[in-house]
Each structure stands twice: as structure tokens, then as C-alpha cells.
């Protein structure tokens, strides 16, 4: 019986230097997919986190709630377009150590698995870009044309 070896990496903060969801939210605002008011709603929480008055998890929780609210009824093609832009730009901003470990595991023919709480349409693109064999992420449900605002 042969055994396969797998290396499991969390994307947000372990491979990538930040949260894919946060970068996608910023780009959705920049591309007018989300209204600018999202930034204003999040700003007090971001400032509180940056001033160490709020835990990062609380800041990220607020950001993800706003993200889920504003992705509802958005066109999947618009969201995907912005997702591609995020991955094109941000996929190079990786921790060197983690990038080297992924490379080493690939050379050893180990399976590479990515996990993330970020949206599946971002994680799948990052996984493809970095050659992961399998990935798990938050699923943002849609009907093929528009996002429902439901996450599993």
C-alpha cells in the first residue's frame, strides 16, 4: 500500500501576505462593482485595527460581513473580472519561505493543498497560479449570473 504525502497551506497570511477577500473588496470598489460607501463603512474598523484597538479577526469579520452583503445580486462576470485582476497583481506578493516550501514539496511530488476562508473564485485562481492539486474555500453561491449573498 503506497501512501501519498500532502502539504497543506493556508493562503491568507501564510502564503499570501494579506487577505484575498480584502484585496478583492478594495478592487471591487475601485472598479465600481461595490459602492464607495463600503469603504466608508469599513474604515472605522480598519482604523481601529491599525491602531491596535480592535483584533484583526474582528476587523476581518466586519469586512467579510460587508463583502457578503455587497456581493449579493452582483453579476458573476463583473466579480470574476475583478478576481482575475487581483490574482494577476497579488499572486507575486507571497512569503518567500512559504513559496520555497511549496516548490520543495512539488519537487518531492507531494500533493499541495490550499485552504482559505476567502471566496472560492479567488482561491481557485490562486491555486491554479501556484500549482496546487486541491483547494478548499468559502463558497459564494450564485445562480450562474448573480451572487445570492449566501456563503457556505
Question: Predicted regions span which residues?
Answer:
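C-terminal cap/substrate-recognition subdomain and adjoining C-terminal extension
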Residues: 2-5, 81-82, 87-152
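A metal-dependent, Asp-based hydrolase signature
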Residues: 20-21, 33-104
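Short, surface-exposed, low-complexity cationic segments
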Residues: 24-31
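Single-residue recognition of alpha-helix boundary sites
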Residues: 21-23, 127
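Residue-level signal for pocket-adjacent positions within structured domains
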Residues: 10-11, 66, 135, 146
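Asp-based phosphoryl-transfer active-site loop
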Residues: 3-21
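Short, flexible active-site loop motifs that bind/organize anionic cofactors or intermediates
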Residues: 11, 69, 113
Amino acid at each position: 500500500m503506497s501512501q501519498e504525502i500532502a502539504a497543506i497551506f493556508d493562503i491568507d497570511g501564510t502564503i499570501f501576505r494579506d487577505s484575498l477577500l480584502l484585496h478583492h473588496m478594495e478592487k471591487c470598489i475601485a472598479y465600481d462593482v461595490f459602492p464607495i460607501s463600503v469603504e466608508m463603512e469599513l474604515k472605522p474598523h480598519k482604523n481601529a485595527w491599525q491602531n491596535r484597538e480592535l483584533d484583526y479577526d474582528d476587523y476581518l469579520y466586519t469586512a467579510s460581513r460587508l463583502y457578503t452583503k455587497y456581493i449579493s445580486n452582483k453579476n458573476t462576470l463583473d466579480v470574476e473580472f475583478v478576481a482575475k485582476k487581483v490574482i494577476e497583481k497579488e499572486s507575486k506578493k507571497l512569503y518567500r519561505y512559504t513559496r520555497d516550501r511549496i516548490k520543495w514539496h512539488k519537487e518531492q511530488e507531494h500533493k499541495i493543498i490550499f485552504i482559505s476562508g476567502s471566496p472560492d473564485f479567488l482561491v481557485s485562481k490562486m491555486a491554479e497560479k501556484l500549482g496546487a492539486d486541491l483547494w478548499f474555500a468559502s463558497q459564494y453561491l450564485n445562480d450562474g449570473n448573480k451572487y445570492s449573498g449566501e456563503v457556505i
